[in-house]
Regions:
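A short, structured beta-strand/loop element
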Residues: 15-48
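Short, charged/polar N-terminal "headpieces" of proteins
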Residues: 1-20
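Generic structural signal for residues positioned in beta-strands
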Residues: 11-13, 34, 80
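C-terminal structural segments of small proteins and small subunits
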Residues: 53-85
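N-terminus-biased detector of the onset of the functional/mature region
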Residues: 1, 37-48, 78-85
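Short, charged low-complexity linear motifs
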Residues: 8-11, 43-47, 51-55
């Protein structure tokens, strides 16, 4: 599971060989959420404050998230994304 960024203590990653639609995962304090890159719809249990943070960050970095999704799906090298909001 390649780590793309760590945003205010929230680990952002995409799993190898993951299912469609394109999405990423965020992990914080034992909680894990999957977020659709296109719709930004979250699935999973995640603290509300951290969910707001990661959704705001993802909106700013949507193109980079999708680019990384495509790279990882093609088994190519991904790149890190800035944690800046």
């Amino acid at each position: 599971m390649p780590t793309l960024s760590i945003v205010k203590g929230i680990k952002v990653y995409i799993n190898w060989d993951d299912h469609l639609p394109p999405h990423f995962h965020a992990m914080f304090a034992g909680h894990d959420v999957s977020i659709d890159i296109e719709t930004m719809e979250p699935k999973g249990d995640f603290p509300k404050r951290q969910l707001r943070i990661i959704l705001g960050w993802a909106e700013c970095h949507r193109d980079e998230l999708l680019d990384n999704w495509n790279l990882i799906a093609a088994n190519e090298m991904h790149y890190e994304i800035s944690p800046e909001l």
